[in-house]
Amino acid sequence: MTALFPFDNSFARLPDRFFARVAPTAVEAPRLVRLNRTLALDLGLDPDRLESPEGLDVLSGRRVAEGAEPLAAAYAGHQFGQFVPQLGDGRAILLGEVVGRDGRRRDIQLKGSGPTPFSRRGDGRAALGPVLREYLVSEAMHALGIPTTRALAAVTTGEPVIRETVLPGAVLTRVASSHIRVGSFQFFAARGDVEGLRALADHAIARHDPEAAEAENPYRALLEGVIRRQAELVARWLGIGFIHGVMNTDNMSIAGETIDYGPCAFLDAYDPATAFSSIDRHGRYAYGNQPRIALWNLTRLAEALLPLLSEDETKAVAEAEAALTGFAGLFEAAYHGLLNRKLGLTTMRDGDPALAGDLLKTMAENGADFTLTFRRLSAAAPGSGPAPEPEAVEAVRSLFIDPTSFDAWAERWRRRLDEEPGSAAGRKALMRSVNPAFIPRNHRVEAMIEAAVERQDFVPFETLLTVLSRPYDDQPDFAQFAEAPEGGGRGYRTFCGT
């Protein structure tokens, strides 16, 4: 019989100081909540075997699969601006890597699988609520077209975990292009371990930026690749109203994937100062701050890479600064290009950033819902065909406390659309493809978690997962899931769940 996971491991070949070899801790009575059968097939796995007792034992950590080399990775990181020289996987264990049907290499990691040498007096376990949140939101992000880690399985353990209260335990099987973080490089830089730093950088180049190996300065090319991916990723976050909530350097993947969903949330009423995380007391990681924080984190990566950029410190700093100066242009191009598409614009004119910015300003002043405003604009967009239905225009106006403020902006928008090529139908299709009808509304996510944790009712989880798998379709039978919460979601708080 073939192996359950056809592991082909590369990170485990690195020197021992990169990780601690540790096996998952067995649990008493695991039960499969959800297997992502589609993802399993994409990875070349057999979903039926994964759902069998054999598969459940591996997905819960009761048994180590054939070919697995379980380990907890070492890394450091800046947490809310303060450097911590040793963090590491405190409740996650990398089982190994598989190469999917598309030829891409992915990590298979268990979260909540027990203590590791990096647990820092923690129990290494995860509660059911955070596991379901990450499963649901990461899969929703994938459906929205945002680069992200994925969820292969969620399993309850049959054991309690002690947090503020006693909660049911769970294990998430996470799939990622890798788990190399900015903090991974900081770990070696902080120790003056240049050879370890070089080995990690060479591994990262081979895995994520193979073309960088041929560059004049491969390590600068690696840095530039990470900068580009992060600039594009954060622009896409802003485009759907996503707030990560804890953008520490140990939570920034060099693969350019969204990772670590602990206190994440989505905008309801548009306000760039929105920060939902209970531990983000000063709004460091607020929605509108995310591009600035991304650059701050990337600057920390550049600092860590200085010994590799050049043996001459002055030249190394110049190389790092030259790479970092590219972030602003990359982000602005990605962000304003996305905003233009959200407004039905396929060409870029000098006044377009101001047009989009003025809409956002008007939305903030009027408490307009971010997702509903852009989705309803899709139906209200004028064009060379028939005028939009009055009901479609009124549906947008009704989102603004002062509808006349929207009217003034909409007139400018209509004049700008008159300059665009293409048909009204094509414009509407474009807008609908980038303006989702459905996002993981915070109040819906909380209701789903409450049902599962308090009543062992997983129907809301399954329903929400189904709806969010088609975020750009209207789905009239599930229209209630597109609705904004009362009060625009103000006062909502998220918690890390560790």
Swiss-Prot record:
Its EC number is 2.7.7.-, 2.7.7.108. ATP binds at residues 88, 90-91, 111, 123-124, 174, 181, 260. Keywords: ATP-binding, Magnesium, Manganese, Metal-binding, Nucleotide-binding, Nucleotidyltransferase, Transferase. The active site is at residue 250. Its cofactor is Mg(2+); Mn(2+). Transmembrane segments: none annotated. The keyword Protein biosynthesis does not apply. It holds the Pfam family SelO. It comes from the Bacteria. GO terms for molecular function: AMPylase activity; ATP binding; magnesium ion binding. The keyword rRNA processing does not apply. Mg(2+) binds at residues 251, 260. It catalyses: L-seryl-[protein] + ATP = 3-O-(5'-adenylyl)-L-seryl-[protein] + diphosphate; L-threonyl-[protein] + ATP = 3-O-(5'-adenylyl)-L-threonyl-[protein] + diphosphate; L-tyrosyl-[protein] + ATP = O-(5'-adenylyl)-L-tyrosyl-[protein] + diphosphate; L-histidyl-[protein] + UTP = N(tele)-(5'-uridylyl)-L-histidyl-[protein] + diphosphate. Belongs to the SELO family. NCBIfam families: PRK00029.1. PANTHER family: PROTEIN ADENYLYLTRANSFERASE SELO, MITOCHONDRIAL. Nucleotidyltransferase involved in the post-translational modification of proteins. It can catalyze the addition of adenosine monophosphate (AMP) or uridine monophosphate (UMP) to a protein, resulting in modifications known as AMPylation and UMPylation. This is Protein nucleotidyltransferase YdiU. It comes from Methylorubrum populi (strain ATCC BAA-705 / NCIMB 13946 / BJ001) (Methylobacterium populi).
